[in-house]
From Swiss-Prot:
SUPFAM superfamilies: RNI-like. Gene3D superfamilies: Ribonuclease Inhibitor. SMART domains: LRR_RI. Keywords: Leucine-rich repeat, Repeat. The keyword Repeat applies. It comes from Homo sapiens. The gene is LRRC73. This is Leucine-rich repeat-containing protein 73. The lineage of its organism: Eukaryota, Metazoa, Chordata, Craniata, Vertebrata. InterPro entries: LRR-containing_regulator, LRR_dom_sf. LRR repeats lie at residues 57-78, 86-106, 114-137, 145-166, 174-187, 202-223, 231-250. It comes from the Eukaryota.
Length: 316
């Protein structure tokens, strides 16, 4: 039987449901487990963690919106991740981890052989967490390093922390998707990120929605896109104080680059993205403007679901 998905959102989990989830994990019948915003007791959370520790079919685990709500649950999840070898995408958006909680998780994350996508948006992180995250980016032996990283809405991270991340992305990472939306980055940090993008050979998607940018940083990004060949395909600049003219110029240049790649490599290389990340802009009820690589696209690219896409590539 092919592995299936279990997706429950915002509901209290009964004992029977928890038993079914654990049985599916132990039988390796679950490829995607999403318990986004679900409510369950500590005992049942521990049962699920013990079951997912040995699951070999589980590729994506979504515990967004407060499921991992205490230090004891963080420790239980860390213990499960130390044993698990199959999870490629881990979503913890909206979990009150703090730097201390990520320090508990980090050893398991650093040693996990399959993890390529990590969502730590709105997790109350600061600069100490950034130091740990930077260590997850580069390849290490058989590990490929992270390919998708979400750090949306972590205002406790200072410019010093963001500069460290920019250096890590530029130097040795394999990151394709970097979501930094709804952080107070400002023009100075955006300038450092432009240098990182220009240096990176892999970064395809950069989300800077609602990050306090102005025309100053937009001009820097425009110069980068215009004068330096990069892998960048999508740059999200909604909810910033940037003129429509500058936004359109950046968008046009990215679209031109994408068209040239399609002519050279064929349209069959286009990545098919999934949405596993919390749609921060939609939660805030904001209007959205994006700079997509595909001029026919009508919506903001909120996430890539890259771990699942990579699994599909491997199976082909």
């Amino acid at each position: 039987m092919l592995p299936s998905s279990i997706q429950i959102s915002g509901e209290p989990l009964s004992g029977a449901e928890v038993r079914d989830i654990c049985r599916g994990l132990r039988d390796n019948a679950v490829r995607l487990l999403s318990l986004r915003g679900c409510r369950l007791c500590d005992r049942d959370f521990g049962r699920i963690c013990r079951a997912l520790a040995g699951a070999t079919s589980l590729a994506q685990l979504n515990l967004n919106l407060g499921v991992v709500s205490s230090p004891s649950r963080i420790k239980q999840l860390a213990e499960a991740l130390r044993t698990n070898r199959s999870i490629q995408s881990l979503f913890l958006h909206g979990s009150p981890l703090t730097d201390a909680g990520l320090a508990l998780l980090n050893p398991a994350l650093a040693l996990h052989p399959a993890l390529v996508a990590l969502d730590l948006g709105d997790c109350m992180l600061g600069d100490e967490a950034i130091n740990l995250i930077c260590g997850l980016l580069p390849p290490d032996g058989a590990k490929s390093g992270l390919k998708e990283l979400t750090l949306s809405a972590n205002p406790g991270i200072t410019p010093k922390g963001w500069s460290r991340l920019a250096i890590a992305v530029a130097h040795s990472s394999q990151v394709r998707v970097l979501n930094l939306d709804y952080n107070p980055l400002g023009d100075h940090v955006a300038g450092m990120l432009a240098v990182a993008v220009a240096s990176s050979r892999t970064l395809e998607v950069l989300d800077l929605e609602g990050t306090g940018l102005t025309n100053q940083s937009a001009q820097t990004l425009l110069d980068m896109v215009e004068n330096y060949p990069t892998a960048l395909r999508s740059l999200v600049l909604a909810e910033n104080s940037i003129s429509p003219e500058l936004q359109q110029q950046i968008c046009d240049l990215l679209s031109e680059g994408e068209e040239e790649e399609e002519v050279a490599g064929g349209a069959g290389d286009t990545q098919e993205w999934e949405r596993g990340r919390e749609p921060a802009a939609h939660q805030r009820g904001s209007s959205s403007w994006m700079c997509p690589s595909d001029p026919s696209s009508q919506m903001v690219l909120m996430t890539s679901g890259l771990g699942d896409s990579l699994l599909a590539e491997t199976e082909m």
